[in-house]
From Swiss-Prot:
Glycans are attached at N81, N226, N358. It catalyses: Hydrolysis of terminal, non-reducing beta-D-glucosyl residues with release of beta-D-glucose. This is Beta-glucosidase 13. InterPro entries: Glyco_hydro_1 (IPR001360), Glyco_hydro_1_N_CS (IPR033132), Glycoside_hydrolase_SF (IPR017853). Coiled coil: none annotated. Keywords: Disulfide bond, Glycoprotein, Glycosidase, Hydrolase, Signal. Disulfide bonds join C219-C227. One of its GO terms (biological process) is carbohydrate metabolic process. GO terms for molecular function: beta-glucosidase activity. A beta-D-glucoside binds at Q50, H154, N199, E200, Y344, E414, W459, E466, W467, F475. It comes from the Eukaryota. It comes from Arabidopsis thaliana.
Length: 507
């Protein structure tokens, strides 16, 4: 009965979505700050490896992304790496000034694990220079009236732990992550009141252990011949399991040792697109439900029920899906104060026969996920092929989370679009303004229906190192000149946000 109920729920939301599939917007919606609740937070986001630079300075140890991009430049589209990135390590005061200038009330950043613990664990010692850097950043934010939202892990596993036991493939990572999170809470929690344990664990398992296009670059050979090792049928589920347990242990530490005195909140940032059925058939509707089970629900359901989604349990055969002990399940249930949602795009899902050969996390849902239907894209394409613009998906995803997962407090922790890097300083990004206006309008719609959304973070404050695509695309509200001292130039979209947010001050 439970499965039928939730499948029906998916059908209802999918039917609501179908009314405007691939609808083109002819104009930018007009928004006012007063369209959102008074306490609604607007901010911008970055991550450590993408913007900090200073990869080999002040005692920082290497992460798997240093190894992946520096030792194997052919794995990055333009052969670059994040060793300097946007140089926020040295220019953080300027970046905080930009946040203040735009009018943002919060900044979501991540902490570099290997900058705090160069060898990944307590045995390797704590790097005081790393502690000092984040203290300085946090204090600078607060001096400008900007709330820090800190992410503890944004994909940059210390290389030492990867060498020792395979990083998140090894069960040992759970305790090492708990210790690392403990250090963060102890040193920064008196001022940081909003924490995210993990950023996009789904991307870690999909791109790092199935597709093999992101660090540590593991996959089955039949998926990607460039992978030298890996197993897309088993490793993703083990890594995902350890990520979930690491999250649970970190939340447990905070609640037991720090919450009473620091009075902060701990959540997680999950990414997902919305999945619409390819056709109105019952089979495709079920395929859309399974696609959600293997993406958003994969990491959300254990935090609500202590169990994996039923569709995962049913579809992942041959004992490949780990199970939680009763103790672990109890720890995980309710292990969040809020949920961060990273949304960029949506897809169609089509029912396909379940595969018995060349099985991976991608084939287990028995659903073909595509951005096109009969040759027509679900929405206009940004610079990246995967980013098809479908604003209504953000509304439907928020309502899905509300109704299926006990009405959680939610923040949009990432949302944005990219443009191709041309080598010329181009600050006229009207298409980005249109993207944000359309998505914010849909967030506002979700709130009006009852979604408990408390804030919105634009991705990204700065042009940065965009993982496997390097510097070939730009997501920033602020242009960074990577050829001239990392100079910053606010784009038209930054000025659009400033105008939107200045209404509150005028009123």
């Amino acid at each position: 009965m439970r499965t039928k109920y939730f499948s029906l729920l998916v059908f209802i939301i999918v039917l609501a979505s179908n009314e405007v599939i691939a609808k083109k917007h002819s104009s930018t919606p007009k928004l006012r700050r007063s369209d959102f609740p008074k306490d609604f937070i607007f901010g911008a986001a970055t991550s450590a490896y993408q913007v900090e630079g200073a990869a080999h300075e002040d005692g920082r140890g290497p992460s798997i992304w240093d190894t992946f991009s520096e030792k194997y430049p052919e794995k990055i589209k333009d052969g670059t790496n994040g060793s300097i990135a946007s140089d926020s390590y040295h220019l953080y005061k300027e970046d905080v000034g930009l946040l203040h200038q735009i009018g943002f009330g919060a900044y979501r950043f991540s902490i570099s694990w290997s900058r705090i613990l160069p060898r990944g664990n307590l045995k390797g010692g704590i790097n005081q220079a790393g502690i000092d850097y984040y203290n300085n950043l946090i204090n600078e934010l607060l001096s400008k009236g900007i709330k820090p939202f800190a992410t503890i892990f944004h994909w940059d596993t210390p290389q030492s732990l990867e060498d020792a036991y395979g990083g998140f493939f090894g069960a040992e990572i759970v305790n090492d992550f708990r210790d690392y999170a403990d250090i963060c809470f102890k040193n920064f929690g008196d001022r940081v009141k909003h924490w995210m344990t993990l950023n996009e664990p789904l991307t870690v398992v999909q791109q790092g252990y199935v597709a093999g296009v992101m660090a540590p670059g593991r996959c089955s050979k039949f998926t990607n011949p460039n992978c030298t090792a890996g197993n897309g049928a088993t490793e993703p589920y083990i890594v995902g399991h350890n990520l979930i347990l690491a999250h649970g242990e970190a939340v447990k530490v905070y609640r037991e040792k720090y919450k009473a005195s620091q009075k902060g909140q701990v959540g997680i940032a999950l990414n997902a697109g919305w999945n619409l059925p390819y056709t109105e058939s019952a089979e495709d509707r079920l395929a859309a439900a399974r696609a959600m089970a293997f993406t958003f629900d994969y990491f959300m359901e254990p935090l609500v029920t202590g169990k994996y989604p039923v569709d995962m349990v049913n579809n992942v055969k041959d004992g490949r899906l780990p199970t939680f002990t009763a103790k672990q399940s109890k720890m995980l249930k309710g292990s969040y104060d809020f949920i961060g949602i990273n949304y960029y795009s949506s897809s169609y899902a089509k029912d396909v026969p379940c595969s018995s050969e060349n099985v991976t996390l991608f084939s287990d849902p028995c659903a073909s996920v595509t951005g096109e239907r009969e040759g027509v894209p679900i929405g206009p394409k940004a610079a990246s092929d995967w980013l098809l613009i479908y604003p209504k998906g953000i509304r439907d995803l928020l309502l899905y989370a509300k109704y299926k997962f006990k009405d959680p407090v939610m923040y949009i922790t990432e949302n944005g679009r990219d443009e191709a890097s041309t080598g010329k300083i181009d600050l006229k990004d009207s298409e980005r303004i249109d993207y944000y206006a359309q998505h914010l309008k849909m967030v506002q719609d979700a709130i009006s229906i009852g979604a408990n959304v408390k804030g919105f973070f634009a991705w990204s404050l700065l042009d940065n190192f965009e993982w496997a695509t390097g510097y070939s695309v730009r997501f920033g509200l602020v242009y960074v000149d990577f050829n001239d001292g990392r100079k910053r130039y606010p784009k038209k979209s930054a000025k659009w946000f400033r105008k939107l947010l200045s209404e509150k001050k005028r009123n």
